[in-house]
C-alpha cells in the first residue's frame, strides 16, 4: 500500500476528530443550574416562573424584569383553543393569546411511532417551550389580556387555503385589543397581527413584544458525529447568523438593537423563530435567564418593536411572523435573510448548499434520496477526476522511483543529511513533487466534510428510505451491512496498489480498513453509502489510470520530444 494513501486516510480521520472537537467547543456539556432560593409570593405560593419582558420607555427600550406568570401546572384545558391545518396542530392559551403547543403531523417521532408527531412547542412545565407575544404600556410593563374567541376549535378544511383565528379582549387600561393569527395551507409560518383601539380619553403608548420561552432541554446522547446544535440563535443585517448557546446566555444577556433581523430556538432538524413585521424599523433584541433550583433554567429570547402612539379614539396595528417547523432552506429564506443559516451546515456552508442543491435536483428525477446520494457522489468524482488521476499518476511515479531511492539508502547508509540531499536531487531531476499524490486528494476533503453536513443536517433525509433493509438514511445501518461493504471497498481499492516492500506498510494495508469499518459502524447510513460509492468510483478510476499509465507516460515523452525539437 502506498504511504501517500496512508497519510490521506490519517488526515481524514484527524479531520473527523477535529469536527468532534469543534462541536465540543460550539456545544459544550450542559452546566448544572445554579441553585436559587425562591421567595414566596404574597399568597404563599413558590413561583417556578418566568418573567415576561418589561421595557423602559425611550429609544433604547432596555429590558428589565417585572411581574411573574406562574408555570407550576399545565395550562387549563378550558383556556385552550385548538387549531389544525394540514401541517400544524396548534394550541393557543386565551390568557395572553400565546401558542403553548405546536405539533407537526407530517413528521412522526420515529418510524416505530408513525402516529406520534414531532412536538416543538409545549406548555408542560418540565419541558416548557412556548411562543409568546403581547403589548407593553408606556411604562414598559407587559399587559396581560384575557382573550375570547368565537370557537374552541379551528380546522383548515379541504379546499380552504387560509385559516384566521381572531381573539378579542380588553386590557386593564381599557384598550380594546384584537389579536389575529393567520394560518396558510402547506405553510409553517403563522402571521400575527395586533390591532389596538383606544376607547379611553387618554393617549396610549406601547410596543409589541414577541419572545420564545424555553426550558433547557436534556442533553441528547448522540455519537459525536451526529450531534447537532440545540440552542438559541439570531440574525441581523450585520451578522446574518449567530449562535447563542445556553452557556453564553448564562454569562450575558442579549441587549442590542437592529433593523429587521430574527430570533430563534433551534434543535436538530426543527426550529421556532420570530420575525419582525416591518424590516425597515429598528427593534430591540433581548434575553434573560430564569434560574431554577430543581430543574434546568428557563431561557427567554425575543424582540420589542418601536413604541406606538395611539391618540384617544384612534387605533393602530402592528404585526410579526412566527415560524414553527422543519429547517427547509427555501421556506426560511423567504421569511428573513440569514434564517436559512439555521440549517447548521458548518463552516463550509456555501459548499454544502451547492451540494444540497445538486442532491435535490437529482432527487427530483429519481425520487429516492439513497440513489440521489449515489448519483451525486458519482458526479462529484467525475468533476474531480483530473485531480484524482493526477494523484494516481504521481503515486505511480513515486513507486517507479522506489528502487533508485533504495539504492540511495544503501549508498549513503546512516548519513541522513546526505540521503535527504540525494533524494531531493533525484526528485528535482525527475521533476517529481513528493507531495503530488496527496495534495490533489486533499482538495477533495472539504467536499467530503460539506457532504457530511448535508447528510447529517438536512431534514429531507430524516426517515428517508433507500432499498431493502435501509429504512432511514439519517441513522446507522441496523445490521451493519453498509460499514462492512465499505471496509471491503477499501480493501479492493488497496488491492489495486502494488504491495509495498515495507512490512509496516503491508500491515497497515490490512489494519486501516478494519479501523475505518469500526469508525463508520455508527455513522448514518446515508454517509456510509456516500463513502462506499466514493471508494468504488475511485477504485474504478484508479484501475483505469493504472491501465493507461504507460500509454500516458509515452504520450508525455513524445510531447516533450516535440518541444525539444522546436
Swiss-Prot record:
One Pfam family, short name please?
60KD_IMP
**UniProt record, GO biological process:** protein insertion into membrane; protein transport
Q: What is its main location?
A: membrane
MF (Gene Ontology): membrane insertase activity
User: What keywords sit in the KW lines?
Assistant: Cell inner membrane, Cell membrane, Chaperone, Membrane, Protein transport, Transmembrane, Transmembrane helix, Transport
Location relative to the cell: Cell inner membrane
What CDD domains does the annotation carry?
Answer: 5TM_YidC_Alb3, EcYidC-like_peri
Describe the task this protein carries out: Required for the insertion and/or proper folding and/or complex formation of integral membrane proteins into the membrane. Involved in integration of membrane proteins that insert both dependently and independently of the Sec translocase complex, as well as at least some lipoproteins. Aids folding of multispanning membrane proteins.
Protein name in UniProt: Membrane protein insertase YidC
Name of the coding gene? yidC
